[in-house]
């Protein structure tokens, strides 16, 4: 059975320069991991802009996100960890 992992990226593209840098790196790394681990893991990812996306705003409140960019990681449907800042792409493979 494949391990189920979901990466949720939270950023603000309008004013956060770090978010604009990390967002494409997050997406590229998520796609790379999907391909690399396609036989052993079911990896999904989504990006939310916390300025105008209601679901993103809900997640910020629920998981008490205090800084952006942030990534929420869910393993087997359970919240596993919150990662912030430029470390996001580097830490993703550790969850697979």
Which residues are covered by each model-predicted region?
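Local sequence-structure signature of Cys/Sec-based thiol-disulfide redox active-site neighborhoods
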Residues: 1-36
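Feature detects long, helix-prone N-terminal segments enriched in hydrophobes
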Residues: 46-48, 94
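Short acidic active-site motifs
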Residues: 55-59
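Hydrophobic beta-strand anchors of alpha/beta hydrolase catalytic cores
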Residues: 7-8, 45, 71
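Short loop/turn motifs at secondary-structure junctions and domain boundaries
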Residues: 62-64
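Non-catalytic, surface beta->alpha helical segment in thiol-disulfide oxidoreductase systems
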Residues: 66-96
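A generic structural motif
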Residues: 38-45
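Conserved acidic residues
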Residues: 49-54
């Amino acid at each position: 059975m494949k391990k189920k992992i979901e990466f949720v990226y939270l950023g603000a593209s309008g004013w956060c320069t770090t978010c604009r840098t990390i967002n494409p790196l997050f997406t590229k790394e998520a796609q790379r991991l999907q391909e690399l681990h396609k036989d052993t893991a079911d990896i999904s990812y989504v990006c939310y802009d916390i300025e105008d996306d209601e679901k993103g705003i809900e997640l910020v409140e629920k998981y008490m996100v205090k800084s952006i960019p942030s990534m929420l990681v869910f393993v087997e449907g359970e919240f596993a960890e919150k990662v912030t800042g430029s470390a996001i792409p580097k830490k993703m493979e550790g969850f697979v």
